[in-house]
Swiss-Prot record:
Organism of origin: Mycobacterium sp. (strain KMS)
EC primary class: transferase
Descriptive protein name: Homoserine O-acetyltransferase
Known function: Transfers an acetyl group from acetyl-CoA to L-homoserine, forming acetyl-L-homoserine.
The keyword Transferase is annotated on this UniProt entry: yes
């Protein structure tokens, strides 16, 4: 069931999903998407001046459902449960936490699985979007809600890339930022692993050139393989070896056609994603991450970052092998509004920014203190 459209200057009820219609959107490439909708959720009350909004920006396979139980509009519990609420790091007695499903997504916002104006799914006709385009769409949704400035933008991974683009491209609209587990641009390693995941999906015969949505076919095998590969980059090497080692799965014999325990684990992760996520969205957002470069059109990374004065906290995870600490160190050194890199000690790899809620919660609280100054 499609979530109800949110009238201008109105937010959905707390924890519920609404949709903001922002009209046509011109992308960085010059392409135009007609009739764009952005799904939105919020926790906490908007202040009379509409100046207490904390934007919480999700990663690749996330959505607007930051916290709370599963429900009709969100098949899984909140992806950052406990981060927002009364007394939480984003204390909803003071702040209004707002989250959108990103442009190109599949959980209420316009994306490849959405119905185009001609009545058919966009599929392969959905244009390439960039991180910059995603921020443009978020800002348009906020403007439709009568919100012209936010207290903070908070995000990790793709959410961190969005937060970075936000403060560099639109500094007058934000008072502080928390950028976690991301870099200033995509690296060769990231582009390599991400493009390989996309290739796995496109090699699935059920991909149908991206136009599978109204055929009854779904590229489940390709998406599951992509997720298995991605999940390896999300977790820490030591953590995985401690959990699984080279052990067999149950009574299976890997030397006789059986599986290793880690294989079973990755298969499970792939199957879980297939149940809730669209392959076209996975390709669209993965390609957006590969194109991430905050310095594009701004004189390069150094010039772009050094020109940003927004008070910012940058955090990285010790065992992150997808976005290693050197990338956050570069951000911390070049952003004038950052006083140094904050390191989260964790064995959980890239996912540490999601798992280590106590340590990350402290960074969120500090970020919101910056917004109060």
């Amino acid at each position: 069931m499609k979530s109800p459209a949110v009238p201008a200057l109105d937010l959905p009820a707390e924890g519920e999903t609404g949709v903001v219609d922002i009209g046509p959107l011109t992308l960085e490439s010059g392409a135009v998407i007609d009739d764009v909708s952005i799904a939105v959720q919020r926790w906490g009350e908007l202040s009379p001046n509409r100046d207490n909004v904390v934007m919480v920006l999700h990663a690749l396979t996330g959505d607007s459902h930051v916290t709370g139980p599963a429900g009709p509009d969100h098949p899984t519990p909140g992806w950052w449960d406990g981060v927002a609420g009364p007394g939480a790091p984003i204390d909803t007695d003071r702040w209004c936490a707002v989250s959108t499903n990103v442009l190109g997504g599949c959980r209420g916002s316009t994306g490849p699985s959405s119905i185009a104006p001609d009545g058919r799914p966009y599929g392969s006709r959905f244009p390439a979007v960039t991180i910059r385009d995603q921020v443009t769409a978020d800002l348009a949704a906020l403007e439709a809600l009568g919100i012209t400035e936010v207290a903070a933008v908070v995000g990790g991974s793709m959410g961190g890339a969005r937060a970075l683009e936000w403060i560099v491209g639109h500094p007058a609209t934000v008072r502080s930022a928390l950028i976690l587990a991301v870099g200033a641009r995509a690296t060769a390693d990231q582009i390599g692993t991400q493009s390989t995941q996309v290739a796995a999906i496109k090699a699935d015969p059920d991909w149908c050139g991206g136009d599978y949505h109204d055929t009854g076919r779904v590229p489940s095998t390709g998406l599951a393989i992509a997720r298995r590969f991605a999940h390896l980059t999300y977790r820490g090497e030591v953590e995985l070896d401690d959990r699984f080692g080279n052990h067999a799965q149950g009574d299976e014999s890997p030397t006789d056609g059986g599986r290793y325990a880690v294989q079973s684990y990755l298969e499970y992760q792939g199957a879980k994603l297939v149940e809730r996520f669209d392959a076209g969205t996975y390709v669209t957002l993965t390609d957006a991450l590969s194109s991430h470069d905050v310095g594009r059109g701004r004189g390069g990374v150094r010039a772009a970052l050094q020109g940003c004065r927004v008070p910012t906290i940058v955090g990285g995870v010790t065992s992150d092998r997808l976005y290693p600490l050197r990338l956050q160190q570069e951000l911390a050194e070049l952003l004038p509004g950052c006083t140094g890199l904050d390191v989260v000690d964790s064995v959980y790899g890239h996912d540490g920014f999601l798992v280590e809620t106590e340590a990350v919660g402290k960074l969120i609280r500090r970020t919101l203190e910056l917004a109060e100054r």
